[in-house]
Amino acid sequence: MGDIDEDIHIEMHREADELGKFATHMMIHAPKTMTRDEAAAALGELLSVITKRCMDHGADLVGHVKAFLKASNGAMSASLIDLGKGPNITHDFGHEATFQDAELTLHVIVHGIWDPEVREQSLEAIETVFKKHGLNYEIIKDYYETEKGMAHHGG
């Protein structure tokens, strides 16, 4: 699809739902072992920073910003629907649980800006927050570029 066709395609979606969306799946590695509280702090900060960046760049409403982290010894989920209230984080890690490697799935839905802007703000937030917390990451799948389009077009 050419750039002009893609712009028209995006505008059609904009008129239909006015929602900007982004999702990604990644692997995370902590060079130093993280406690569950450190992981929760990083995950909560990630959702807050993504949401704030989207709002600062034109979003006027949070649909849902959520993340699911899975490590060998447990899982953690975080959800944010109101920036003022902050994220809600749940997990099944034991009190002394630690991890170094995990999978992270992230979904971002906001109102008022388009997918490319949501993607850009999300990726910049990931870079900023993970760097601050000393986390390395590798994006396994960027659903904005692949499955999103295929699913939409019946692929």
Put a short name on every predicted segment:
Residues 2-155:
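P-loop NTP-binding site
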